[in-house]
Curated annotation (Swiss-Prot):
Entry GO CC: plasma membrane
Family statement: Belongs to the TLCD family.
Domain spans labelled TLC: 33-227
PROSITE patterns per the UniProt record, alphabetical: TLC
Membrane topology: Multi-pass membrane protein
Protein name: TLC domain-containing protein 2
Keywords of this entry: Cell membrane, Membrane, Transmembrane, Transmembrane helix
Subcellular localization(s) per the UniProt record: Cell membrane
Transmembrane segments annotated in the record for this chain: 6-26, 40-60, 79-99, 117-137, 167-187, 194-214
Organism name: Mus musculus
Domain of life: Eukaryota
Principal location class: membrane
Length: 310
């Protein structure tokens, strides 16, 4: 049975890695800039739908997996846990292949803890019910992944994004914090039925997943709910494609002496160039015209505005 469970996990790993590769051949939304991240989150959404809904239906139909999370479970529940092991391993490889360790260390720690705990149930055939309860967390991940896809598609200031943010917070409490609390309570009461190594492994997994879950909830609450304008768009410069502020050409010409006349320029333009002279500053009509074109209706130009976002 152990080899059979590992075979299912290996097949799941291959399938999800193939899905990562296959999505590269399909187009992504035009508004998405980080295409790899969008594909990665999309694959994660597929797994969350499969495992989260499967765990909810399984626990609803077989509540004995909650009353006896060590031994009592239907055979297909072990298959679902093995599929999740393959997914988390495939997702970890995908992150290592496309990101640096500094960028993905937190999720890699999460995946390592989850794979270690779930693979114990797959290999031993025990604690499958406990693992099924942990897969309820994927119901919250569905909302988190949808929110992330909207964010990557630059749909943050929208009704759909705000609904996904509220849904993420609600499901985080219902399907993430409550299951984690139940698992912690069960482990504290039934730890004598487990070996010391397994207890330490479960504690490490609960602490890792719990801390990441709490930090995620705080981040969504502060950025999406409490802020009036979450994730404002920063339009990029059309040519440089960077997020650096583009300086406006509002500089003036300082005159140190008395009045200066641009006789040479006036003669070249046939005497049609109006010269603005000042003891301190002088600005040509072309610069003034550039300012007027960039100003929005109803706003007043200030000479002190040196830069803006374009």
């Amino acid at each position: 049975m152990a080899s059979w469970g590992l075979l299912v996990a290996g097949a799941s790993f291959t399938a999800f890695r193939g899905l990562h590769w296959g999505l590269q051949l399909l187009p992504t939304p035009k508004s998405v800039r980080d295409r790899w991240m969008w594909r990665n989150i999309f694959v994660s959404l597929i797994h969350s739908l499969l495992s989260g809904v499967g765990a909810l239906v399984g626990l609803w139909q077989f509540p004995q997996m909650v009353t006896d999370p060590i031994n009592d479970h239907p055979p297909w529940a072990r298959v679902l846990v093995a599929v999740s092991v393959g997914y988390f391993a495939a997702d970890g490889v995908d992150m290592l292949w496309n990101q640096t360790l500094a960028q993905a260390w937190d999720l890699l720690c999460h995946h390592l803890a989850v794979v270690s705990c779930l693979s114990t149930a797959v290999v031993s055939g025990h604690y499958v019910g406990f693992s099924m309860v942990s897969l309820l967390l994927e119901l919250n991940s569905i909302c988190l992944h949808l929110r992330k896809l909207l964010l990557l598609s630059h749909k943050a200031p929208s009704l759909a994004f705000r609904v996904s943010s509220w849904a993420s917070l609600a499901t985080l409490v219902l399907f993430r914090l409550l299951p984690l609390g139940w698992m912690s309570l069960w482990l504290s009461r039934q730890h004598y039925q487990l070996s010391l190594a397994l207890v330490l492994l479960c504690v490490a997994g609960l602490v890792t997943v719990g801390s990441i879950s709490i930090s995620t909830g705080i981040r969504i609450l502060t950025k999406d709910i409490l802020q009036s304008q979450p994730y404002p768009f920063i339009l990029m410069h059309k040519e440089t494609k960077t997020r650096e502020p583009v300086a406006r050409n509002t500089s003036t010409l300082s005159l140190k002496g008395s009045r200066y006349l641009y006789s040479t320029a006036a003669a070249a333009l046939g005497g049609h160039l109006m010269v603005l002279a000042s003891p301190k500053r002088c600005m040509t009509p072309s610069v003034l015209g550039l300012q007027e074109r960039r100003l929005e209706p109803g706003k007043v130009a200030h000479a002190d505005n040196a830069s803006t976002w374009e």
